[in-house]
């Protein structure tokens, strides 16, 4: 069974600093890196387009970690994010919350 977990659900970050949001996943056996797609989506209440600012640190994927780096966090980055990991035909997601201290 493919599952995604988050070691930390809430991140409280000073405005202007960097943050790395972490999602962990367990493939249950040998990992085929080519079959993994990881994404972080901001959950928006409105329909305005949101430019994704998070960068996936791919070197951690073989360790079962999807790390998403957001540089120089701004108030507009605050909110709920959905971390989605797709592995072949299986997928799972978890929610993370980012709060910004101005």
Regions found by a protein language model. Name each.
Residues 1-5, 41-46, 90, 96-102:
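Flexible inter-domain hinge/linker segments at boundaries of tandem extracellular adhesion modules
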Residues 7-9, 36, 94:
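Residue-level marker for the onset of beta-strands and adjacent loop->beta junctions
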Residues 12-15, 42, 72-75:
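Conserved strand-loop elements at the edges of beta-sheets that form or border functional pockets
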Residues 17-19, 34, 64, 94:
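Residues at beta-strand starts and edge strands
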Residues 21, 26-53:
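N-terminal V-set
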Residues 24, 51-99:
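Ligand-binding face of N-terminal immunoglobulin V-set domains in extracellular IgSF glycoproteins
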């Amino acid at each position: 069974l493919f599952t995604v977990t988050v070691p930390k659900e809430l991140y409280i970050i000073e405005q202007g600093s960097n943050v790395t949001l972490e999602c962990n996943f367990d493939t249950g056996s040998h990992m085929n890196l080519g079959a993994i797609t990881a994404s972080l989506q901001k959950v928006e209440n409105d329909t305005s387009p949101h430019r994704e600012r998070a960068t996936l640190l791919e070197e951690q994927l073989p360790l079962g970690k999807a790390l998403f780096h957001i540089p120089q966090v701004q108030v507009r980055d605050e909110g709920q994010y959905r971390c989605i990991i797709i592995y072949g035909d299986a997928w799972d997601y978890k929610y993370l919350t980012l709060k910004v201290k101005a």
